[in-house]
Structure formats: C-alpha cells, structure tokens
C-alpha cells in the first residue's frame, strides 16, 4: 500500500524486452532496498528484483504492460517513485494500492495565478468514481479532484507538486496512469446490485409518468 506522496523522481537507465514482458533498470537514490519489496513506479506497484548503488531492477509482465504506459518507457524517461507504506508512517495523501485502473489522456494544461490546472479524460465506465474534492492518484501522485468535467476531471497542482514530481512535465496529449479512490470503488461495487434491480413500484411509476 502507498500514500501517493512521491519520495523522489527516478530515471529509466535500462530497458530489456523479454518473452514474459519488460525488464527495467531505474536510477534511484535509495540506500536500503530489499530485494522483493514493493515500489510504486508512476503509480504502478512493481517488485524490486535486484538492486545496487543508486539503482534497482524490476519487471512488468504482459498484463501490466497492457494496462499501463510502461511499454512506452525508454532510457531517460523520468518516473515517480514511492516505497510501500510502513505501519508507523503518516498517511499524508490517501490510500493508494498501486493498481492502475486506466490510462488517461491529458486534455489541457493551463496556468492559473497560483497553480496549474490539468484536465484529464475519464472513460464513461469510471465517471461515477470521481466527486469534487475527492481523491485520485495520477502517475502515483495523490491529488484532489478540483472539478468534474464532461467525461473528465480537472486537477489543480501547486508549485511544490510540479517541482517534485513528473507532473510538471505534462503537456496536452500525454498519457498518465489513473487510480481511482479505493473507497469509491468498493462503495460502487456494493451498490451495483441495488442499482441494477428495479422493483415493481419502479415500473408502476414509469407507467404513471408515461400516461
């Protein structure tokens, strides 16, 4: 589990295609890695397979490549990094699982007086997971939904976030990982049976309105 508070920005320094997927080597200023531990790389939970001084190696299988932008990463790509949350740590962002729900396209980037506004496309099937001032993870960064848009959301990014994550590099058309709030996903799942079912009273009401 993660919080969406990026610890540092790493850099892809090696990529190798394999039969199982893709192996990555990433430059990172961590000194106490453990092989097998989890790390969020642009919000995707991956496993440290090997590490050395200022680098670690990880891999993404085919299923992960299909659901993320990892297949597009190349040497020099900058990525947001966050190690897994300790039980004693502060939960400064929100609960992030590292499970990318979908890849979104940046619709617009506009500078306001004290922030940068970023508009993202949201698929119709996921629109109900977002509410104004709700939480969302974008490329692993915990953010607040500033406003709901037609088939999209608007985010407001402060200067600190722009400087300390890769989100300051975003331009219209860029593709980003989006993970909706896990609480919203569970609530929607619990309500789905009730939303699908229609009682006889519903049918009677519809008939009355039509006649």
Regions found by a protein language model. Give the residues of each.
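Conserved loop->alpha-helix
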Residues: 1-211
């Amino acid at each position: 589990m993660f919080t969406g508070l990026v610890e540092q920005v790493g850099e892809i320094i090696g990529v190798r295609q394999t039969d199982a997927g893709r192996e990555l080597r990433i430059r990172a200023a961590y000194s106490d890695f453990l092989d097998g531990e989890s790390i969020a790389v642009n919000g995707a939970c991956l496993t440290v397979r090997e590490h050395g001084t200022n680098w670690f190696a990880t891999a993404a299988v085919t299923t992960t490549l299909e659901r993320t932008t990892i297949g597009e990463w190349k040497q020099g790509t900058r990525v947001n990094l966050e190690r897994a949350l300790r039980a004693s740590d502060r939960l400064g962002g929100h609960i992030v699982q590292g499970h990318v729900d979908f890849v979104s396209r940046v619709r617009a980037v506009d500078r306001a007086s004290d922030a940068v506004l970023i508009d993202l496309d949201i698929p119709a099937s996921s629109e109900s997971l977002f509410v104004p001032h709700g939480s969302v993870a974008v490329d692993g960064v915990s953010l607040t939904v500033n406003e709901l848009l037609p088939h999209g959301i608007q985010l407001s990014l402060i200067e600190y976030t722009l400087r300390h994550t890769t989100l300051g590099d975003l331009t219209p058309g860029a593709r980003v990982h989006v993970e909706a709030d896990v609480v919203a996903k569970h609530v929607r799942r619990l309500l789905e049976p009730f939303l699908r079912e229609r009682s006889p009273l519903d049918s009677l009401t519809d008939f009355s309105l039509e006649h």
